[in-house]
């Protein structure tokens, strides 16, 4: 197969590093924080994860696009990643579920992307210097000077509240479960078969989190990020779920206030990723920006109570500071990569959080039993 003519593209980092390659997405420009993800598969799930808003994602696996794309693998209604960086795009996408090639998918979603660069060199820079502000410039008139100027214009994620930007604007009900191989679909479960009612705060929720809850018997009501606690509690939930999301948790004062009000009740609370960080802030801890963050599907995490080590999917650039935990908040999990805090639990309430992604998508589901723990916490209320 003859390789088609390509459009030039440039990736510039704020430190002055320049990478020339070819465009595989939309023409134009994009700026954001450049991070690297070590997952070998799941590029469509990564692109559509709202937690990647304002981030340009570098995939360290060299061949990306082999299996094309399918609507069934999307984790939200659009691509949220600010841009994509890869080493090599295969000429053919081959998979029985493939509906659209990766380049066509990127163009349809107006996503700027670059291929043909040395991603190993780029990853070393990001690993040694930390996440960098950057720019991808795609088009025949792209220049290094312009790309560098744009890269340095990005203010960074510190202090940036993105949860309210990616959140839904109106509440909705979710009853779709995990993918069924026989029907090749995500089946919709009748409300009569879902005994638990969970209210989920959407700070950038992934579809597979909602599916995991439904698969365990939950009818889920998804609320906008800025919904007051009074409105959430008026729905008479059996449990409150705090979703994942992008950006810095500290500016999300509306969410912190709402969680504090929820914690005044006896309703079980479970937080993932940004939701975990917001639970920590609402309980009196502080959060910090990490040098490189955790982005991948192979991160070992240890359960501090049992000693069990689990391989987890991770995607975060901020974390709760363990040294700041108040007396009523204890550490439950730690990263074996860098020792950062991965799990917390209130000692005075039925409330806990996990920094990684138990729902995976992509990645392993070693930590999925945390969903079962949430169900068990709600069971006494439902059984009464």
Swiss-Prot record:
Keywords in alphabetical order: Amino-acid biosynthesis, Arginine biosynthesis, ATP-binding, Glutamine amidotransferase, Ligase, Nucleotide-binding, Pyrimidine biosynthesis
Enzyme Commission number(s): 6.3.5.5
Keyword Ribosomal protein included in the entry's annotation: no
Subunit structure and binding partners: Composed of two chains; the small (or glutamine) chain promotes the hydrolysis of glutamine to ammonia, which is used by the large (or ammonia) chain to synthesize carbamoyl phosphate. Tetramer of heterodimers (alpha,beta)4.
InterPro entries in the record: Anth_synth/Amidotransfase, CarbamoylP_synth_ssu, CarbamoylP_synth_ssu_N, CarbP_synth_ssu_N_sf, Class_I_gatase-like, CPSase_GATase1, GATASE
Protein name: Carbamoyl phosphate synthase small chain
Positions of region (CPSase): 1-193
Superkingdom per UniProt: Bacteria
Natural source organism: Stutzerimonas stutzeri
SMART domains registered for this protein in UniProt: CPSase_sm_chain (SM01097)
Active-site positions on this chain: 273, 357, 359
One function term, GO molecular function aspect: ATP binding
Pathway connected to this protein: Amino-acid biosynthesis; L-arginine biosynthesis; carbamoyl phosphate from bicarbonate: step 1/1; Pyrimidine metabolism; UMP biosynthesis via de novo pathway; (S)-dihydroorotate from bicarbonate: step 1/3
Catalyzed reaction equations: hydrogencarbonate + L-glutamine + 2 ATP + H2O = carbamoyl phosphate + L-glutamate + 2 ADP + phosphate + 2 H(+)
Biological processes per GO annotation: 'de novo' pyrimidine nucleobase biosynthetic process; 'de novo' UMP biosynthetic process; glutamine metabolic process; L-arginine biosynthetic process
Biological role stated in the UniProt entry: Small subunit of the glutamine-dependent carbamoyl phosphate synthetase (CPSase). CPSase catalyzes the formation of carbamoyl phosphate from the ammonia moiety of glutamine, carbonate, and phosphate donated by ATP, constituting the first step of 2 biosynthetic pathways, one leading to arginine and/or urea and the other to pyrimidine nucleotides. The small subunit (glutamine amidotransferase) binds and cleaves glutamine to supply the large subunit with the substrate ammonia.
Key word Ligase present: yes
